[in-house]
Amino acid sequence: MGKVIGIDLGTTNSCVAVMDGKSPRVIENAEGMRTTPSIVALTDDDERLVGQPAKRQAVTNPEKTIFAVKRLIGRRYDDPTVAKDKDLVPYKIVKASNGDAWVEADGKIYSPSQISAFILQKMKETAEAHLGQKVDQAVITVPAYFNDAQRQATKDAGKIAGLEVLRIINEPTAAALAYGLDKAKQGTIAVYDLGGGTFDVSVLEIGDGVFEVKSTNGDTFLGGEDFDMRLVGYLADEFQKEQGINLRNDKLALQRLKEAAEKAKIELSSTTQTEINLPFITADASGPKHLTMKLTRAKFEALVDDLVQKTIEPCRKALKDAGLSAGEISEVVLVGGMTRMPKIQEVVKQFFGKEPHKGVNPDEVVAIGAAIQAGVLQGDVKDVLLLDVTPLSLGIETLGGVFTRIIERNTTIPTKKSQVFSTAEDNQNAVTIRVFQGEREMAADNKALGQFDLMGIPPAPRGMPQIEVTFDIDANGIVNVSAKDKATGKEQQIRIQASGGLSESEIEKMVKEAEANAAEDKKRREAVDAKNHADALVHSTEKALAEHGSKVGEGERKAIEDALADLKEALKGDDSEAIKAKSNTLAQASMKLGEAMYQQQAEGDAARDAAQDAAKDDVVDAEFTEVDDDKNDKKSA
């Protein structure tokens, strides 16, 4: 069995880690960074960029640079939270044929799972480069408050990326694993996790290697991106007041504002004032316009105060569900880049009544926890037991559109529960089971996960047939539902696939596309390598010809010059095979030149050695007389 890696698939940044012996280790990417921006860009020449290279070109290619796609994963296009994002991102969010929110770039539409798969592929390649072996299994983290559709979509992303996802693990739980491993601590901790796009809070009991989640709560559409967008809105409004130009209509300006807002937000965590300076942000008939503005920490905190306060209600609910007061929490662990913001730390301290623990790296701790869980599954990490919970209640729609819960929220998983229902009409021969997830009393107000029919029920008065509905949640938090007619033994079951979601055939198609893209990327990389090698060969040959061309015959020199001209011509195109062939021809033709250079060097070395030997022969040995000190000592009187 190869290595199982742990991946934190984040909204803003992603991170990959692996167990190195008994210790988890974060792996640096090709750019030497420990985290990778969760950004994918498609360039004009059909190249796909992921991570830092994608982020670097975002300003000049805003419509084809996709970021924060995790906020769309497993969501419907008509979801109000999607509508909110649609106006704020420079790329296009479109409605897929299944009603899900997808993204469009370069005339093609991509599912959020596909875009996430490109990021996961980058994580996979990062791990493979470090380990020197193929990696095809992973533990991937998701926000604790992700519903079934979002978990399934994340698992699909792993499959498209060529990874077998052994476990989907909740981010706060992963952070608790990283915090609690190798610590002899016992007690109840709260993990406050405010990342780039999601917020979670989990209450856990830790002791003797057992990590038991007591409750979890959160908001899957609240994170650093919202703080950035709030600042973008403020900057755009101020500029419009001053210049009368709405920057929201300019995709390029919007992307520059987004980058400036993120930078200012980060700076204000360590300084009380920053300056935002964006020259040539736009232009009108009177000429170019510049945006220059000073922003204080106090002003920024006032702009986002409601977002900060929004994190407190989930904390309150999580404590209530766990049956605990804030005073009974022994430690509060901060996770996610947003927790570096002083205002967040202050609010957490006020609510829990204690200084939060800042001893973990908020950007890396989740990936480290995922690697530990990978180690547990591989058998490398012993004596660790993780007991997680389902974040939302699961149930079915019953008569009158009521949501009847079968599994309550915060139930430890894996779990299996059954309940018996009956028919609503006389002689009813089929029932439709509609499955929902959520906390509202009416089914329609909750998240519809899917539906299926149980057919062939024998005719009987209403209320007589006994239909047993069973919910089975696995360790990934993914749901299976079955319905059985107890009289006939007939059973119907489904692995929940949201009314949206990706079908098996769609996933297979995307897997094949990803493999084809990987092959295409490899070809493109080989072409770049061939060009680089050819450029270096041209340079070295020209230099050698200039310095040593006179040492070879006229015919040999002409052969080298012709091969050089052919290679230069080939370099004007993109045919890597032609470039390789012409490079080989030039290398062969240049061999005589190389021989002449080496011969000259050998002759020079021989002459130098001869000169040194002659110099040695001319050395005169000095004559000396040994003096015996004892004989020279005068005897004392």
From Swiss-Prot:
Keywords: ATP-binding, Chaperone, Nucleotide-binding, Phosphoprotein, Stress response. PROSITE patterns: HSP70_1, HSP70_2, HSP70_3. Residues 620-630 have a biased composition (Acidic residues). Pfam families: HSP70 (PF00012). Residues 605-619 have a biased composition (Basic and acidic residues). Induction: By stress conditions e.g. heat shock. Coiled coil: none annotated. The modification Phosphothreonine is found at residue 198. Belongs to the heat shock protein 70 family. Acts as a chaperone. This is Chaperone protein DnaK. It comes from Afipia carboxidovorans (strain ATCC 49405 / DSM 1227 / KCTC 32145 / OM5).
